[in-house]
Amino acid sequence: MTNNAPENAQSYRKRILEKIKPYFSGDSLLDAGCGDGEDAALMAPFFKKTEAVDLEESVNWKKFENTGIIFKTGNCEKLNYPVGSFDTVVEKDMLHHASDPVSAVKEMCRVSAKTVIILEANRYNPIFYLHLTLMGGHQHFSQKRFKEIIAASGTPYEIKRFSARVSPVNSAFMIKLVNNASDLLEKIPFYGPVIEYNMAVLTKK
């Protein structure tokens, strides 16, 4: 498989992978709301079995047909899997599209045997609000609403937050500069309310 994505996009995805990797559990993964499949492909080497599901098929899935990843269409509010089918379930930026996000979280918890990792962009990050909410029409959650949705699942959880963004210029210098800035922003307490990503790690008892 050849990854033809620009280096700045790859760096952004890899940074997010480094943030969630410590919470991976077991041998099997479900990427819920996988989109183009690029994130599933990054996570797959850490598991013996990887499946990925999205409401609509992406033409990009064909790129990964020889990787062993199983792609399926399906609704994450009603996943077509038995209880505890996967050790780890990961979701990134799908939940705000769900008609009932609480039901979607409960479904991910139902099909997980160990861990659910949920990532959603912070609605009130200044750059994300301009680019994703005002211009893109995405209704991302505030930190308060995100926590309410996670808590309503009834599964024990921890809330984490981190900084990650795509470098606006595809150059090694700018990519490094953006990543260094993200490292710095994570250490500044007053940046917390507008930091780029909210993450929940839900652990099955």
Residue ranges of predicted features:
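Short alpha-helix
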Residues: 138-155
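A short, conserved alpha-helix within the catalytic core of class I
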Residues: 98-107
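Short, glycine-/aromatic-enriched active-site segment of Class I SAM-dependent methyltransferases
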Residues: 121-137
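Conserved alpha-helix/loop element of class I SAM-dependent methyltransferases that forms part
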Residues: 8-26
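A conserved beta-strand element that flanks and buttresses the S-adenosyl-L-methionine
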Residues: 90
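Class I SAM-dependent methyltransferase SAM/SAH-binding core
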Residues: 36-78
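A C-terminal cap/extension of S-adenosyl-L-methionine-dependent methyltransferases
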Residues: 71, 160-205
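Conserved beta-strand signature within the Rossmann-like core of class I S-adenosyl-L-methionine
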Residues: 114-121
